[in-house]
A protein has these predicted regions:
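Short, charged cytosolic
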Residues: 1-4, 158-182
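Membrane-embedded catalytic scaffold of the fatty acid hydroxylase/desaturase
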Residues: 1-132
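A short structural micro-motif
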Residues: 54-55, 167, 263
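Short alpha-helical linear motifs
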Residues: 69-76, 94, 141-145, 278-282
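Short, highly charged, low-complexity non-transmembrane loops/tails of multi-pass membrane proteins
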Residues: 77, 304-314
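A membrane-cytosol interface segment of integral membrane proteins
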Residues: 118-166
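Substrate-recognition/cap regions that form aromatic- and gly/pro-loop-enriched pockets
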Residues: 189-276, 280-306
Length: 314
């Protein structure tokens, strides 16, 4: 589930490299480093290698760099990683290496980028949303639904251990899922939003980033409990404005949850509205303005967005 989120991007650029799962906060790599720490490897080694390892997996997410000569035989290059992200039959489940390409050559998963097969990016079951929260949990929710719907006990159990894309026969027949059969017929997800709505989305994203840093800055003052609720507020906020860009009515419901979270925090602190600190005033004012903005765009653009999305699905 967690790597599908990274691959759900239908473009291949540096922004794609930043599309990571929420569960990345609990990284398997950190667990695997515990034995090294126990054996006495200095902490500065981890501090040095961490950023290097991160950058070495970041830079090759680009279509602008062609093949790199002899380096193609040593390190993972943009060409190698374009193959890894391709949904073409020739490229599926290939080039898993992160830094040194030798591992794919040793385990039989290496594939060179073919001149006559241009990689098509994304996933075989398109996410079809701009909402990162939905993208994070969509595949997991599908597994839960399939496990519940299948009639065979054995399928309810093994679905959690089968390869990606596997579904019980009875569920696949009764509840078909849109899957890309021919990569070159892929229709990239697109919503025909007005410039005003796109501008609203950019403003919302910018404010969310500022409020995120503000939450970090004020964490010592608020403590873990309140900081946790403010983090939840930010996640619901992202859910709200990306759902609005998707043309979904439940974006307004998410705005209601935002206001409820802030009201709970105010109630928990046992202070009146007039005595709120600046941080809380900003969060409350933003929640109200954001909700009014959602109401406006739902009223003026929802019919237009739904019409465009239906025509795209056809």
């Amino acid at each position: 589930n967690r790597h599908i989120i990274h691959h759900s991007c239908e473009e291949f650029n540096l922004a794609c490299a930043l599309r990571q799962s929420i569960s990345e906060t609990i990284h398997f790599g950190a667990i695997l480093m515990i034995p090294a720490a126990v054996l006495g490897v200095p902490a500065k080694i981890f501090v040095i290698l961490g950023p290097i390892h991160l950058f070495m997996q970041f830079w090759y997410h680009t279509r602008l760099i062609d093949k790199m000569g002899w380096l193609e035989s040593v390190i993972v290059t943009p060409s190698h990683h374009r193959v890894h992200h391709g949904i073409n039959p020739e490229y599926l489940d290939k080039n898993y290496s992160q830094i040194l390409i030798i591992w794919d050559k040793l385990f039989g998963t290496f594939q060179v980028e073919l001149a006559d097969v241009k990689p098509v990016y994304g996933i075989l079951r398109p996410a079809n949303t701009w909402n990162p929260i939905i993208i994070n949990y969509k595949h997991l929710w599908q597994l839960i639904q399939d496990a519940f719907r299948t009639e065979r006990i054995w399928d309810k159990t093994r679905i959690w251990f089968m390869p990606t894309g596997w579904r019980p026969d009875d569920v696949a027949l009764k509840y078909p899922i849109n899957t890309i059969a021919n990569p070159f017929e892929q229709k990239k997800y697109k919503t025909e939003n007005s410039l005003s709505l796109l501008g609203w989305g950019y403003i919302q994203m910018s404010i969310s980033l500022i409020m995120m840093f503000l939450t970090f800055y004020m964490a010592p003052e608020h403590g873990l409990f309140i900081t946790g609720f403010l983090a939840l507020f930010l996640m619901v906020n992202v859910f709200s404005y990306t759902s609005l860009i998707d043309g979904k009515k439940y974006s307004l419901f998410a705005d209601g949850i935002k206001i409820a979270i802030i009201c709970f925090v105010i109630f928990h602190q046992k202070i009146g509205l007039l005595n709120l600190n600046l941080n809380m005033k900003i969060f409350l004012a933003y929640s109200i303005i954001s909700t009014l903005g959602t109401l406006y765009f739902l009223k003026t653009e929802l019919n237009h967005l739904n019409t465009e999305m239906k025509s795209q699905e056809k």
